[in-house]
From Swiss-Prot:
Pfam family, one: ATP-synt_C
Residue numbers marked as site, Reversibly protonated during proton transport: 61
Protein keywords: ATP synthesis, CF(0), Chloroplast, Hydrogen ion transport, Ion transport, Lipid-binding, Membrane, Plastid, Thylakoid, Transmembrane, Transmembrane helix, Transport
Membrane spanning residue stretches: 4-24, 57-77
Protein name: ATP synthase subunit c, chloroplastic
Gene name in the database record: atpH
Membrane-protein topology: Multi-pass membrane protein
Length: 82
């Protein structure tokens, strides 16, 4: 029974980190592309656009870090293992 729980935990950890990285990865790509496009259209707003971009990228990256925390909890502090 413990081997099944361990195997399921490893699979769940892989899915957690993989799925947690898909959304923010796509979002970061779109945000960076739109920021470059906005700076190209209005070069005088570069500082404001860059600041907003960096803040939004940090929030998006936090989602991936939450997935990493869940994966590490499943691997090393598994509440289902006795």
């Amino acid at each position: 029974m413990d081997s099944i729980i361990s195997a399921a935990s490893v699979i769940a950890a892989g899915l957690a980190i993989g799925l947690a990285a898909i959304g923010p990865g796509i979002g970061q790509g779109n945000a960076a592309g739109q920021a470059v496009e906005g700076i190209a259209r209005q070069p005088e707003g570069e500082n404001k656009i860059r600041g907003t971009l960096l803040l939004s990228l940090a929030f998006m990256e936090a989602l991936t870090i939450y997935g990493l925390v869940v994966a590490l909890a499943l691997l090393f502090a598994n509440p289902f293992n006795g």
